[in-house]
Amino acid sequence: MRAEHTIFVCTTCGSKWEGGKRVGESGGEILLKHLQAHYPHWELNTEFRIQPVECMSACDRSCVVSFASHDKYTYLFGDLSPELSPAEVEGIFQCAGKYYAHPQGLLPWGERPEPLKKGILARIPAVPTPLQINCTEAKICN
């Protein structure tokens, strides 16, 4: 079965740079390892994949993750510690579970764990399907 939901993790976040080159392990890579370590035990691991991303352009708000799926909002969260506790990792997975359960992926502020309440960077609308675009154009044109 192919996962239809994705947790993206920026692996450039929290990098140290010397002479224009990245040195050592980034905060994002550490965060990714923590999520991957708990992922096999997560009940939704067949519904989500964890995808490393080279840069998500939120450098001032590292570390960054996002939840994305077809026909759903995409959420971008920042200000996450790379050294997540097991409870914080569980909070991210619980929030992803709420995202999975909601048809449009809506995540009300009060239902998010603390790090994902104050670290919200964006809620991006789903890309309209061709059918939705044609329907909207028909309403505009009539």
Residue ranges and their predicted role:
Residues A58, G78-P82, K118:
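Generic structural "secondary-structure junction" signal
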Residues F77-H102:
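A hydrophobic, small-residue-rich beta->alpha segment in the mid-to-C-terminal subdomain
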